[in-house]
């Protein structure tokens, strides 16, 4: 049946740019990719996009810890993420970043529209402040007991146990994640999105029947408890977009993160030179379909805040949210100590991508159920289904076709009724792919695979091959087997892209959904090559051990300037203003008799001479080389009496010590006596 081509935009939740992709992430990206590949097979116009979620205090602090800029860190992480997704053959049309000009412009546009429409409210709030670090604490940097369900060790914005959202100030016994200190309250003006104004619209959207039943039920609980205004601002220091006309205030990461879907699509349109599609997809009355694949932990943001923000800024709402559960490994939460917290890149060092794609797909449904990756069952299922049932069907027939018939298939089907049984299944299997009942689709396909192998077993081509005068029968039987293999691989094409490529090369034809209605008759196939290898538990053991070793390596002490010499406690501007830094000319430099560490420097401050002892001898074995250089000194440091004389200040140098000491110098043009400001 010919379908009307649809315009579809599909997104996955944006991975946070401060960590590697792991098998928990991959469930969502594989689920979405299988669905997208099926839609493309049916002739629909699909744009599949994602991006890194690149803002927030965690990224700012981790970059500081690594001694690099946030921009450098998120750039490196983006490359790593894209490499992982490419390794799993996730067919994104575009992968972008929320730290982009497109996202900045769209965030400011949506904010300005919300403000113009009266949906942004200002008020002063009491906020948790870390007295040791001298900074306001973002939601995720406060932990305590959930005020709703009383679960301990929950973040300051939402509870991972009951799903409730709340203010960090509502936490019971809060602690700073940064320092462990008990936060104190300080006042700060913040901006709030008036979510309650959209309650009626959101309830109507919930009752529309589009959302998963579990999502709709959860939303109803939130409506009954009452929607609250949403704090969309954060105080400096913060890595993100500064709010227009609000110095020192930044958009909360959860405001610009979902807008990143729009930013990535805008970036894709611009790359294509397409000035039309963005508005066509995102305008209020768009006929394009918009689907977000997300995990159950972020339903609140996507089912309430996001559609309300879009409604309030005159953009279209999502067609639907496709929500999935978590991944467990061997029936337990992923564990670093047990080696079951497995990174995507580590997996690909031990197994191919198709194996995990198949296993996840076989277990997925349209419900929000957790998926267990049982590693022993994984090995058994991949070998039983992919190797023994599907690939074996091709291999046990291809040899005869290649050797006895020069690769040419029979001109007629040996069993047209059986072939029709296979092609008639397209409707049921297609509906299962469409409705995300992936496990059902796989069960239907494997039932057909059993039927195909039973046919070959009953026809016994290996026996027929030994009987004189039965060449035509042999060709017909094996051609039938290969045609059934072709149908199976067509149904599995959304799941197994690499195996599909090898199957298409052997079959000498592209696998298309509608193409199976016409069997391959009198068609020449290519010489058969091994399509897929068996896997075993030794690979699993190596994978688990490698994951354990990675955890050990990650737990090793972090090295680098900031790790070796952490930043001191925060001081006020008034404290810093007391330090008088001046440019000084080194008029003379010489060794200090009786000291193997000091040099005596004679400094000219532009009308005043100073004598300074500096512990830089190990880095400057030839003091004469310093004469004539400009440097920076602390000019108002109290004179210090030493056994070699009086030191009248301090010169500024950087480095860990020893030979690695580097005297600081001002830029060209600075003159002795100039104050450093």
UniProtKB/Swiss-Prot annotation:
One Pfam family here: tRNA_bind
Entry's transmembrane regions: none
Binding, ATP: 336
Family: Belongs to the class-I aminoacyl-tRNA synthetase family. MetG type 1 subfamily.
Essential cofactor(s): Zn(2+)
GO biological process: methionyl-tRNA aminoacylation
Keywords: Aminoacyl-tRNA synthetase, ATP-binding, Cytoplasm, Ligase, Metal-binding, Nucleotide-binding, Protein biosynthesis, RNA-binding, tRNA-binding, Zinc
Motif interval(s): 'KMSKS' region: 333-337
Gene that this polypeptide is encoded by: metG
Enzyme class: ligase
Oligomeric form and interacting partners: Homodimer.
Species: Shigella dysenteriae serotype 1 (strain Sd197)
Sequence positions that bind Zn(2+): 146, 149, 159, 162
Compartment(s) of residence: Cytoplasm
InterPro entries assigned: aa-tRNA-synth_I_CS, Anticodon_Met, Met-tRNA-synth_bsu_C, Met-tRNA_ligase_1, Met-tRNA_synth, Methionyl/Leucyl_tRNA_Synth, MetRS_core, MetRS_Zn
UniProt function note: Is required not only for elongation of protein synthesis but also for the initiation of all mRNA translation through initiator tRNA(fMet) aminoacylation.
Cofactor remark from the record: Binds 1 zinc ion per subunit.
Classification via CDD domains: Anticodon_Ia_Met, MetRS_core, tRNA_bind_EcMetRS_like
Catalyzed chemical reaction(s): tRNA(Met) + L-methionine + ATP = L-methionyl-tRNA(Met) + AMP + diphosphate
Chain span(s) of sequence motif 'HIGH' region: 15-25
GO molecular function annotation: ATP binding; metal ion binding; methionine-tRNA ligase activity; tRNA binding
Identification of the protein by name: Methionine--tRNA ligase
Gene Ontology cellular component list: cytosol
SUPFAM superfamilies the UniProt entry points to: Anticodon-binding domain of a subclass of class I aminoacyl-tRNA synthetases, Methionyl-tRNA synthetase (MetRS), Zn-domain, Nucleic acid-binding proteins, Nucleotidylyl transferase
Enzyme Commission (EC) number: 6.1.1.10
HAMAP family per record: Met_tRNA_synth_type1 (MF_00098)
The tRNA-binding domain, residue ranges: 575-677
């Amino acid at each position: 049946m010919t379908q009307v081509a649809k315009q579809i935009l599909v997104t996955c939740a944006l991975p946070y740019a401060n960590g590697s992709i792991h098998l928990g992430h991959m469930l969502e990206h594989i689920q979405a990719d299988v669905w997208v590949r099926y839609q493309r097979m049916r002739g629909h116009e699909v744009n599949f996009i994602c991006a890194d979620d690149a803002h927030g205090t965690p990224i700012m602090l981790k970059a500081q810890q690594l001694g690099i800029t946030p921009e450098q860190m998120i750039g490196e992480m983006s490359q790593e993420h894209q490499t992982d997704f490419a390794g799993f053959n996730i067919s994104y049309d575009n992968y972008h970043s929320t730290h982009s000009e497109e996202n900045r412009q769209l965030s400011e546009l949506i904010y300005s529209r919300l403000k113009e429409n009266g949906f942004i409210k200002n008020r002063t709030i009491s906020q948790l402040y870390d007295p040791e670090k001298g900074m306001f604490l973002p939601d995720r940097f406060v932990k305590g007991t959930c005020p709703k369900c009383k679960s301990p060790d929950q973040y300051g914005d939402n509870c991972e146990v009951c799903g409730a959202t709340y203010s960090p100030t509502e936490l019971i016994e809060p602690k700073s994640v940064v320092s462990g200190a008990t936060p104190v309250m300080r006042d700060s003006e913040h901006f709030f999105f008036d979510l309650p104004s959209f309650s009626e619209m959101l309830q109507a959207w919930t009752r529309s029947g589009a959302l998963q039943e579990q999502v709709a039920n959860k939303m109803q609980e939130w409506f009954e408890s009452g929607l609250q205004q949403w704090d969309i601002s954060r105080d400096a220091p913060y890595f993100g977009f500064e709010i227009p006309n609000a110095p020192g205030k930044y958009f909360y990461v959860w405001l610009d993160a979902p807008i990143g879907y729009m930013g990535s699509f805008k970036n894709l349109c611009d790359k294509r030179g397409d000035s039309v599609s963005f508005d066509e997809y995102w305008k209020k009355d768009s006929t394009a379909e918009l689907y977000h694949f997300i995990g159950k932990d972020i339903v609140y943001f996507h089912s309430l805040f996001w559609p309300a923000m879009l409604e309030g800024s005159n953009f279209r709402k999502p067609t639907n949210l496709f929500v999935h559960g978590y991944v467990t490994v061997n029936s337990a939460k992923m564990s670093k100590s047990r080696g079951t917290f497995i990174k995507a890149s580590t997996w690909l060092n031990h197994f191919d991508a198709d194996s995990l794609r198949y296993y996840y797909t076989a277990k997925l449904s349209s419900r929000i159920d957790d998926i267990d990756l049982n590693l022993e069952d994984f090995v058994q299922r991949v070998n039983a289904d992919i190797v023994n049932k599907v690939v074996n069907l091709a291999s046990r027939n291809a040899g005869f076709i290649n050797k006895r018939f020069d690769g040419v298939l029979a001109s007629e089907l040996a069993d047209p009724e059986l072939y029709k049984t296979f092609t008639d299944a397209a409707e049921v299997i297609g509906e299962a792919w469409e409705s995300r009942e992936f496990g059902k689709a796989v069960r239907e396909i494997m039932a057909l695979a059993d039927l195909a192998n039973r046919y070959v077993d009953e026809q016994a081509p290996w026996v027929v091959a030994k009987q004189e005068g039965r060449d035509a029968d042999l060709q017909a039987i094996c051609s039938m087997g290969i045609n059934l293999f072709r149908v199976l691989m067509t149904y599995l094409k959304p799941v197994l892209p690499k195996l599909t490529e090898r199957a298409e090369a052997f079959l000498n034809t592209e696998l298309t959904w509608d193409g199976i209605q016409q069997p391959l008759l009198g068609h020449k196939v290519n010489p058969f090559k091994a399509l897929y290898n068996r896997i075993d538990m030794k690979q699993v053991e190596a994978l688990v051990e490698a994951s354990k070793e990675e955890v050990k390596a990650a737990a090793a002490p972090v090295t680098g300037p900031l790790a070796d010499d952490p930043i001191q406690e925060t001081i006020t501007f008034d404290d810093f203003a007391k330090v008088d830094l001046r440019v000084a000319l080194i008029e003379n430099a010489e060794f200090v008799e009786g000291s193997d560490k000091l040099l005596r420097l004679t400094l000219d401050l532009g009308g005043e001479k100073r004598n300074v002892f500096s512990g830089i001898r190990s880095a400057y074995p030839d003091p004469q080389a310093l004469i004539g250089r400009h440097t920076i000194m602390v000019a108002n440091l109290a004179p210090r009496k030493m056994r070699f004389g009086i030191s009248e200040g301090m010169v500024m140098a950087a480095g860990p010590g020893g030979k690695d000491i580097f005297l600081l110098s001002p830029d060209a043009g600075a003159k002795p006596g100039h104050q450093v400001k």
